[in-house]
Amino acid sequence: MGGNQESFDCINHLNNVFVNTIRGLGGNNRYRHLMITTNGAGTSEAILSNLDIINDDYVIVSVHAYTPYDFAHDKTTITSWSVNNLSQTKSIDDVFNRLNNHFISKGIPVIMGEFASRDKNNLSSRLAWLEYYLDKAVSLGIPCVWWDTGQFKSDENMTFSIFNRNTLEWLFPEIVEMLVSKTK
């Protein structure tokens, strides 16, 4: 899982063109923080190993990680998550260990540009998962952005939302509270 050399070369080229274009505009653009991404915004070893790091003090690497996938993203019947389930915690640990090894430990900032867990009528498991996930991210200084699709119960394919944009109400205030309290 992770792409091929052609896709790695393409994203590296686009990242370089992007950074060089913004920097070439002059003024304060040389100090502007810019986010580059990995192939598919992925976090596998193959993907992270093939990202060309741009020598620029204001570049941030943006990735996405819905992990463990069968709990967080897939529409499977996997609805429970527990800190005592080593395969589930290992999935999260592995992602953050790779991000630390490739970037954080080298002074390269990372942002988790997308993460979330699908609503499967499993709020207590989602909260346990979120607490563990955020603890790992915060320990490395990685800010996380919850992927709110704007869709909820009416669309089973993308039930990651925590805010109802029609009624302007929080669907899962407990998730919002944890997002805020863990990242202060």
Where are these regions (language model features)?
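Aromatic-rich peripheral "rim/lid" segments of glycoside hydrolase catalytic domains that contact
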Residues: N122-K184
